[in-house]
UniProtKB/Swiss-Prot annotation:
This is Protein MGF 100-2L. The lineage of its organism: Viruses, Varidnaviria, Bamfordvirae, Nucleocytoviricota, Pokkesviricetes. Belongs to the asfivirus MGF 100 family. Induction: Expressed in the early phase of the viral replicative cycle. Plays a role in virus cell tropism, and may be required for efficient virus replication in macrophages. Keywords: Early protein. It comes from the Viruses.
Length: 141
């Protein structure tokens, strides 16, 4: 057992735990469980996002632009690695070929779109039928 582990066990001994004021115990326990819960919720959200159709570009805008020019009208999720930095919903109109981009952010178990929190994308889609006009199409190029 390393030096770090023995210090941790020393800190968590029953005697040391009894000497800590209750308010600090509550904060410690709440923070510990809340962080674990948040990580679990993020994993759950990322897993459900992976079940949807995603296009994974080679981290350059040219690849995205080329894909959208060749793609038929529809809605697409564009991401490089399903992270908060780059996750977008793109709607391409079949008539004029124009595209609307909406940046999506992951916050715990929620997706933040234009400042509003959604538990899942189905709620967002049902509340805004004008942006989600076409089925999702998967591109694995």
């Amino acid at each position: 057992m390393g030096n770090k582990e023995s210090r941790y066990l020393e800190m968590c001994s029953e005697e040391a735990w009894l000497n800590i004021p209750n308010i600090f115990k509550c904060i410690f326990i709440r923070k510990l469980f809340y962080n674990k819960w948040l990580k679990f919720q993020e994993k759950k959200l990322k897993k459900s996002l992976k079940l949807l159709s995603f296009y994974h570009p080679k981290k350059d805008f040219v690849g995205i632009r080329d894909m959208l020019q060749m793609a038929p009208g529809g809605s697409y999720f564009i991401t490089d690695n399903i992270t908060e930095e780059f996750l977008m919903l793109v709607v391409k109109h079949p008539e004029d070929g124009s595209a609307e981009f909406t940046k999506l952010c992951l916050k715990g178990s929620c997706i933040v779109i234009d400042g509003y929190y959604y538990d899942n994308l189905h709620i967002f889609i049902s509340e805004t039928p004008d942006i989600y006009k076409y089925p999702l199409i998967r591109y694995d190029r």
